[in-house]
Amino acid sequence: MAKDFRYLCYPYMRESVSTVDFEIRTDSLSTKIGLASSLTEHLPKVHDDLLYLAEMSYHLNGSVRGMTAIKEEDLNTLSQMYDRYVLEVEDRIQTFVLPQGSTAACVLHTCRSEAKKSVRALHKVSTEMKVENILFKYAHLLANVLFVMAVYVNKCEGIEEIPFVCKSYKDKI
């Protein structure tokens, strides 16, 4: 008798390994990147980049349990994307900024936060099994790309960044 998959949202849900948490995190990340793409249709390059990143975050997702799908070429593409956005917003990212602005920028900041959670989940996986270093590089860079994209979208929308000065660390940085 075939299993009825309507009662199973994810086949690995009952596993106790951290790989499952990483996969759920990166699924959430890809979903939020998809939301961000729907809010940036008026910015075609951002929209296209986000659709690409949604797909790549799923490749990152499967690269722990399965074959490593993230390759050096993918890391280079992401690095070039980062450089392209930094060139546009360099003057706006010299300080820590509040996650605010347009709805699209706020969703991109949420994506950035999800990417950081994915990095943390990947670290947890690495305490249980070997994780290719390229996956860490990609996940960290992805968070940074999403940050500069958020700032870029605010720039396109004519919204100024609001600097944040931390009272806890101001003498330590």
Q: Language-model segments: which ranges?
A:
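Phosphate/pyrophosphate-binding loop motifs in nucleotide- or prenyl diphosphate-using proteins
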Residues: 1-173
